[in-house]
A protein has these predicted regions:
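Retroviral integrase
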Residues: 1-135
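Charged alpha-helix within mobile-element recombinases
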Residues: 121-169
Length: 169
C-alpha cells in the first residue's frame, strides 16, 4: 500500500516474506532450472542447483535435460563435492521432479528426503538459490564479448560458482 492507503493500480497488494531457519544439520535443497535459450556444445540445456544450508554454498551443475538420468548425475556431482569437503548431506528438500529416481539415489546415500508441493516454492530454498545464481550468471554473460558464442555458456559455470559464493560470504 502507498502511504495514503490507496491501493496501487486499483488492486490490493499482498507482500509475503519467508525466512529459512533449519536446526537439522546436513540439510541440502535442490531443484533444476528451466531450459536455457541455447543448448551448449556439450549438449547441456539446464542447471541442477543445490543449496547447502550449513555451508551457505550454492552449487550449479550443467545438465543435459530435466530427465531422471540428468538430475541424478547432478545429485551425484553435488554429493561427491560435499563429501570431498567433509560434509555429509543427511536431509534433502526438493520438488517432486524425478521423485522415484531421487528416492532411490538418496536411499543409497543414507539421506532422508522431503518433497514439496509443486506450487509451494517458498519451502524450497533452492528456488531462491536459483534466482541468485541466474542473476549472477546472466551478469557474467553480459560481460562477454558480443561475438562470443552463446553455446559455450556452460564453460562459464565454474567461474560463476566461485565468484558467486565469494561475493555472498
Amino acid at each position: 500500500m502507498v502511504p495514503n492507503d490507496e491501493p496501487l493500480d486499483g488492486a490490493n497488494n499482498v507482500f509475503c516474506f519467508a525466512a529459512l531457519a533449519d536446526k537439522q544439520s546436513g540439510t541440502i535443497y535442490t531443484d533444476a532450472t528451466g531450459a536455457l535459450p541455447a543448448i551448449s556444445l556439450d549438449g547441456n540445456q539446464a542447471y541442477f542447483v543445490a543449496y547447502d544450508y550449513d555451508s551457505n554454498y550454492i552449487f550449479a551443475e550443467p545438465i543435459k535435460s530435466q530427465k531422471d538420468e540428468s538430475i541424478i548425475e547432478g545429485f551425484e556431482t553435488v554429493f561427491s563435492e560435499l563429501k570431498s569437503k567433509g560434509y555429509k548431506p543427511q536431509f534433502n528438500v526438493t520438488d517432486n521432479q524425478a521423485a522415484n529416481s531421487i528416492k532411490r539415489y538418496l536411499a543409497t546415500q543414507d539421506c532422508k528426503w522431503q518433497f514439496v508441493e509443486p506450487t509451494n516454492h517458498r519451502v524450497n530454498a533452492a528456488e531462491r538459490a536459483i534466482q541468485t545464481f541466474k542473476n549472477h550468471f546472466i551478469s557474467g554473460l553480459c560481460s562477454t564479448d558480443r561475438d562470443w558464442p552463446i553455446q559455450l555458456w556452460d564453460q562459464l559455470t565454474d567461474q560463476a560458482i566461485i565468484t558467486l559464493n565469494i561475493l555472498r560470504t
